[in-house]
């Protein structure tokens, strides 16, 4: 029995000595958790500005967005790869069309009864030592302010109207005809109406914004505007058509106004805009510019969704409010994170990868968020 007991003890000792090697760490594990940041922090505001510049720059349609406030901000510091910011931004639509390529500082928000507001979620990569600024992904959701809110604040103010309404098209075509008649050297054709409001002044009045393109016709060719043309929009016009009581047999007297602003010409590479140029090229050294042969890699993933106005039902008391700006942005659902290849930003032999985590929710938000609004929305 003593010999048997000795054999058992020896066996246990051998098992303890011959331990298996420790398990390797999980690949792609995050270097550190997301850290909340104050929404009025100077670094956060700077990164939010860069993110919106890039979002505006990659758009082909619509109006530029400006920052109203930072709603939430987190950062993931990643050693030699710099930082990846996760931002939720409250935004306002400006009066500058994205094709104008104006500096955002020159574009103010719209007057309150034309307010279009919303939220954007964005991921933004910053590597200061390597002078890299990059927008991997974004999504935005926008809504106009409801007619009910506008009417409660200003019953006589203009309110939005359907862009396809016959009176809207009439206002656009008649104001463009006026512009063409006053500028006979070159004629322009309507591309599409982008904004329209209506108001009763001394009669029904319509105020429109619309894109125009060059027309190959002269002033004497009335049917030329119907010819097909592949030319790009060259400007944005603002027109109005005000109808007042006329002298019989005329029912209405029409007053038409128009002004047009032309876009600066944009040098395009074959196949469209070079997405590498959208990553704030002035901030990056030449060697870090992404090659033009890989536009699909460098272009940020995202879109801007336009939703109809959100009316608040009269019996909504006690009910959970509907999310006004539903925005989803998830490059991964893996809580441990996945990697995103950004080697094209560095152009070095070794691979460069960012760790991307699921976009954070409201939990563990900084007490300094949301930040202060620049403009109070209706």
UniProtKB/Swiss-Prot annotation:
Q: What is this protein called?
A: Fetuin-B
MF GO annotations: cysteine-type endopeptidase inhibitor activity; metalloendopeptidase inhibitor activity
Reported function: Protease inhibitor required for egg fertilization. Required to prevent premature zona pellucida hardening before fertilization, probably by inhibiting the protease activity of ASTL, a protease that mediates the cleavage of ZP2 and triggers zona pellucida hardening.
Q: Which PANTHER family match?
A: FETUIN, FETUIN-B
Would you indicate the residue range of the signal peptide? 1-18
Q: Which residues form each disulfide bond in the chain?
A: 96-107, 120-140, 154-157, 217-224, 237-260
Among the Pfam families in the record, one is Cystatin
Task: Give a Gene Ontology cellular component term annotated to this protein.
Answer: extracellular region
């Amino acid at each position: 029995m003593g010999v048997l007991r000795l054999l058992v003890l020896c066996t246990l000792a051998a098992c303890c000595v011959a331990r298996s090697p420790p398990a390797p760490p999980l690949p792609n594990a995050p270097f550190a958790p997301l850290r909340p940041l104050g929404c009025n922090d100077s670094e956060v505001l700077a990164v939010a500005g860069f993110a919106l510049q890039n979002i505006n720059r990659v758009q082909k349609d619509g109006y530029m967005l400006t920052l109203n406030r930072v709603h939430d901000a987190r950062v993931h510091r990643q050693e030699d790869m710099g930082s990846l910011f996760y931002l939720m931004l409250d935004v306002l639509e400006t009066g500058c069309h994205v094709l104008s390529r104006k500096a955002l500082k020159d574009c103010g928000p719209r007057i309150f009864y034309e307010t279009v507001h919303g939220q954007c979620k964005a991921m933004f990569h910053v590597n200061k030592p390597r002078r890299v600024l990059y927008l991997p992904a974004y999504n935005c959701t926008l809504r106009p302010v409801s007619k009910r809110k506008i009417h409660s604040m200003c019953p006589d103010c203009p309110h939005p109207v359907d862009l396809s309404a016959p009176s809207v098209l009439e206002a656009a075509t008649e104001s463009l005809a006026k512009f063409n008649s006053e500028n006979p050297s070159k004629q322009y054709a309507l591309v599409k109406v982008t904004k329209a409001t209506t108001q009763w002044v001394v009669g029904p009045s319509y105020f429109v914004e619309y894109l125009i393109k060059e027309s190959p016709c002269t002033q004497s060719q009335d049917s030329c505007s119907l010819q097909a043309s592949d030319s790009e929009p060259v400007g944005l016009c603002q027109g109005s058509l005000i109808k007042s009581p006329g002298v019989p047999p005329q029912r209405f007297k029409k007053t038409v106004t128009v002004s047009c602003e032309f876009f600066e010409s944009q040098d395009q590479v074959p196949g469209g805009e070079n997405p590498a140029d959208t990553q704030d090229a002035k901030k990056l050294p030449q060697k870090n510019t992404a090659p033009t042969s890989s536009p699909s890699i460098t272009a940020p993933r995202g879109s801007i969704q336009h939703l109809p106005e959100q009316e608040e039902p009269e019996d909504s008391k006690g009910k959970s409010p509907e999310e006004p700006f539903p925005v989803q942005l998830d490059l991964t659902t893996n809580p441990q994170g996945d990697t995103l290849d950004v080697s094209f930003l560095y152009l070095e032999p070794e691979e460069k990868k960012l760790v991307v985590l699921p976009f954070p929710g409201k939990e563990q938000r900084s007490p300094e968020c949301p930040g202060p609004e620049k403009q109070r929305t209706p």
